[in-house]
Amino acid sequence: MSKLYEWISPDSDVLEQEKTELRPPSMYKVVLNNDDYTPMEFVVEVLDKFFSMDLEKATQLMLTVHYEGKAVCGTFTAEVAETKVAQVNTYSRDNEHPLLCTMEQA
């Protein structure tokens, strides 16, 4: 009989494992902020490209950004939210638009 088998045999003493409480991850809202220079069409493009919104939903959210100053694009875990914020801000700068994307705790 192998030593490994003897070590895990039912007759051996088993240490009780400590139970850890699993909590859901903290969630963050990704927010688009209005500015006076970014074209509305570009905002719709960003919502389609980075948040997979259809034209109707992207247009509605773009109008919310325009009239209310900001709008939530989605709620994600911290890592996903950080990635989306960075992608949108980089894409906006690469296209010479001042569109600002931020995140805040949900």
UniProtKB/Swiss-Prot annotation:
One of its GO terms (biological process) is proteolysis. SUPFAM superfamilies: ClpS-like. It comes from the Bacteria. InterPro entries: ClpS, ClpS_core, Ribosomal_bL12_C/ClpS-like. Binds to the N-terminal domain of the chaperone ClpA. Involved in the modulation of the specificity of the ClpAP-mediated ATP-dependent protein degradation. Belongs to the ClpS family. This is ATP-dependent Clp protease adapter protein ClpS.
